[in-house]
Amino acid sequence: MAHKKGTGSTRNGRDSRSQRLGVKRYGGQVVKAGNILIRQRGTKVHPGNNVGRGNDDTLFALIDGIVTFEYKTKSRRKVSVYPVAAE
């Protein structure tokens, strides 16, 4: 007879990798063309001036400039990138 109890195995201990969604560059930050501004599912925030939208609704800068968050309408937000004024 066994003198030790057999240890049972657990069926827990797995979880899926999070999707790392959210705002990646905030208002007032300087960005380069191609920088990802927001990773999102659906168009929570819409693309504004000089901002492109990827197949997965990711928003990215089309030009070098400063990020600004604005409202298209009362409830619809957009993000734009405006060029830095040359001094």
UniProtKB/Swiss-Prot annotation:
UniProt keyword annotations, A-Z: Ribonucleoprotein, Ribosomal protein
Identification of the protein by name: Large ribosomal subunit protein bL27
GO terms classed as biological process: translation
HAMAP family, per the entry: Ribosomal_bL27
Region (Disordered): 1-24
Family according to the record: Belongs to the bacterial ribosomal protein bL27 family.
A cellular-component GO term for this protein: cytosolic large ribosomal subunit
Gene: rpmA
Organism whose genome encodes this protein: Crocosphaera subtropica (strain ATCC 51142 / BH68)
